[in-house]
């Protein structure tokens, strides 16, 4: 999921394909805001993976049918370098475009994504002036802090690329207050695998699982680092320089990028290995006999010592030669990186269950231009 150069198909003053409003332009260039779930939102995760593509280390192929996100409050602020050790601090807002906009990232879009060949992005809106500063033109000599929000679905949202199924799914999102919805199928395709408990019977887990994950995780992403600024030197501890800078009489692209692997991580540390076994272990048959798992099935589940529905300890399973479980325990358990686990605790201070753990990791999935990390502010009860 690294940045690669590519052609950008962009409208300068008119935004087509049903995207949102744009401000009136002056002479300082413009910014095209787009959204992408990268190649993985389009094609999912194969197993075994091709080349160096990401994969689920426990042997699952994961494919998406829909990946709906509600974006809002795309904004620019002054002084992205205000606090070298606190990325969340910036100057005041100088421009903002408001939606909300509903996008199905699985459907892709007409633009080439920031990851290059095979990736797609959908145009959201165009900003052509500092609309919170009297429509002043953008200043090509200034870097602006970039941010956006993922918000609860709303019937008033501008639905940009939803088909009939997407419309129905989005209505469910709005009814339930979900911000993000994953719909898809996981199929176990592991072959040569090892386990920390050879006595455990993995045949007790279903081999095909439908998943439907509706996340209650409104989140603000601010002052994002920007891979497009490379090779500019970032602050210590950061990968890229912060902010976005325009060019005179040209369009600069700012892509809100959603990384789809975050809910499946084994730890809260960024880019952790992905697993599906803990989800499969909680799946239940629906009326048609199909195994289905939702986020509600994760409530009450101890993520530090997973068990299957029969109450048996779930071991680590590795179906990738390069993966070794992170600890020597037979029982699979995930690492919350210092955030306490407390089943009856305050959700603002502790993870109560696997539901909280998954939602927390999912809330970090917003980036700028493929891999630019943003300051994350969770707008729901959650540990910092």
State what each model feature region is.
Residues 15-18:
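C-terminal motif of bacterial Sec signal peptides marking the signal peptidase cleavage site
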């Amino acid at each position: 999921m690294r940045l690669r150069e590519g052609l950008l198909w962009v409208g300068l003053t008119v935004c087509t394909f049903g995207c949102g409003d744009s401000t009136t332009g002056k002479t300082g260039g413009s910014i095209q805001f787009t959204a992408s779930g990268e190649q993985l939102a389009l094609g999912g995760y194969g197993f075994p993976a091709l080349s160096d593509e990401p994969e689920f280390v426990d042997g699952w192929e994961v494919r998406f049918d829909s990946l709906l996100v509600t974006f809002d409050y795309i904004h620019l602020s002054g002084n992205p370098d205000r606090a070298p050790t606190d990325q969340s601090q910036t100057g005041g807002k100088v421009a903002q475009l408001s939606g909300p906009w509903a996008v199905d990232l699985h459907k892709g879009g007409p633009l080439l994504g920031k990851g290059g060949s095979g990736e797609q992005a959908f145009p959201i809106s165009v900003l052509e002036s500092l609309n919170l500063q009297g429509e002043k033109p953008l200043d090509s000599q200034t870097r602006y802090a970039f941010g956006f929000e993922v918000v609860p679905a709303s019937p008033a949202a501008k639905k940009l690329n939803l088909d009939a199924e997407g419309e129905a799914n989005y209505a469910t999102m709005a009814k339930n207050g979900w911000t993000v919805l994953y719909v898809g199928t996981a199929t176990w395709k592991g072959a040569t695998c090892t386990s920390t408990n050879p006595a455990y019977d993995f045949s007790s887990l279903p081999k095909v699982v439908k998943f439907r994950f509706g996340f209650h995780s409104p989140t603000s992403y601010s002052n994002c680092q920007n891979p497009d600024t490379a090779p500019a030197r970032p602050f210590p501890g950061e990968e890229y320089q912060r902010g976005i800078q325009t060019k005179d009489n040209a369009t600069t692209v700012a892509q809100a990028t959603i990384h789809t692997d975050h809910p499946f991580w084994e730890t809260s540390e960024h880019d952790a290995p992905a697993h599906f076994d803990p989800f499969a272990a909680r799946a239940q048959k629906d009326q048609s006999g199909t195994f289905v798992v939702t986020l509600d099935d994760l409530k009450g589940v101890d993520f530090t010592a997973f068990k299957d529905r029969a109450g048996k300890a779930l071991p680590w399973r590795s179906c990738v030669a390069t993966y070794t479980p992170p600890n020597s325990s037979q029982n699979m358990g995930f690492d919350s990186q210092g955030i306490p686990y407390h089943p009856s605790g305050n959700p603002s201070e502790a993870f109560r269950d696997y539901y909280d753990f998954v939602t927390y990791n999912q809330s970090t999935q917003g980036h700028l231009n493929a891999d630019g990390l943003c300051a994350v502010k969770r707008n729901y009860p959650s540990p910092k």
